[in-house]
């Protein structure tokens, strides 16, 4: 069994593991081209599709991820995800503000942890996020961590965080063109990019206890690299995200984009540790519909996910 303090620690780590709480605004572009937005990530689909990932931390495998896109009525889509992580070194990954939020020294907590993260979000026909829910479960810990959020048509976002007796809720009025962006876990596609393209992305976390919760990232498409994927060589564009506009600083995050806009690799640096998502080739032995049924069954077993399950069945 984990100590009770670890349950509180999961509340912080949930935002890192599932990453639904990172809000980003696409600012005016540096060049004439518009930056890739939600329309290039999730577009209305007629058929169910899925993407699987292998997760590496500092070149060691630590887990896997699966996301399934389910088409809905009137051009809407639902995105289901499952993130399974094993033996994560918390001392290496926790942000500096974790101790402040927990009220204790994070270095005294358990050195590693296993967890399952379940996510669900709905996106309208315009590519705008309407609601999201997440659950994080840890083996040996009875209480699950629940994250949920809604975005109203007038751009008011409400985020709730709950685990046992602990509850936290915050609301923000966001400017126009804000969208939820998952910074750390992988996005499947980024269509319409070209060499030399640049744009800026402010990252905003409503749970970070700081007076300056917004951080500007500078994105650029610069460089090619040939990757070996699905038994063939693929030429990719490299998209880099930096905390400064010049290209001399090492990137905080990079993505390798294939010729059809598919993201083949997603690498992020978290407090000196390298987190890498490697896209898996399509497994023809299990269809996307079967994967969707499987991932929904996992959600239904997760504590408190019955609300989402009942909504989907209606």
What does each of the following model-derived ranges do?
Residues 2-155, 161-172, 192-314:
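Acidic, serine/threonine-rich low-complexity disordered tracts
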